Amino acid sequence: MAQLVHVNGPPGIGKSTLSALYAERHPGTLNLDVDVVHRLVGGWTDEDNRTWEVVTPLIRAMARTQLDGGRDVVVPQYHARPEEISALEELARKQGAVFREVVLLDERSAAIERFGRRARDDDDTYIQYMHHHVGSRGGAARLGAMYDALLDLLRLLPDATVVPSTAGAVEETYAMLTDALRGPGG
């Protein structure tokens, strides 16, 4: 049975890296990285372009098509509102797929530091854009609030699996992720 795996976690925690690795090692899996799709829309750096209004339906349509074909989808994306998770879960259910919620977590202060380090170490346009975007909206305080919101959400998601994510431990974290997906329901 196909599955839709939502890889959640604070910004900069390793969601995109681990999802790309998962798709690479599980042929046929669609790594539906929202950050990548976002960049496909012309003018995505212009806030007035409201790119998210286009990207969200695109992501859902792509996931639906992949699941209809009986293939897995992995979606690396921070979500901290219950309705965002419910929408993904409902999409999977309507396509006859299993929904899995995996949350990557590090300590709060480490997660905030990892976001900053990512921008210092990587000149990728999207990473730099998001660093500026978050910085203009409160920086570390905003990241802390996002982390706290994610922890609050976890209390509402009894079926979510938390996977510890340590900076630089990609293979170790990947092993825990795949173990979690092989567990009940995976």
Question: What are the residue ranges of the model-derived segments?
Answer:
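Conserved substrate/cofactor phosphate-moiety recognition/catalytic segment
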Residues: 16-69
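Glycine-rich phosphate-binding loop used to anchor ATP phosphates in small-molecule kinases
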Residues: 54-99
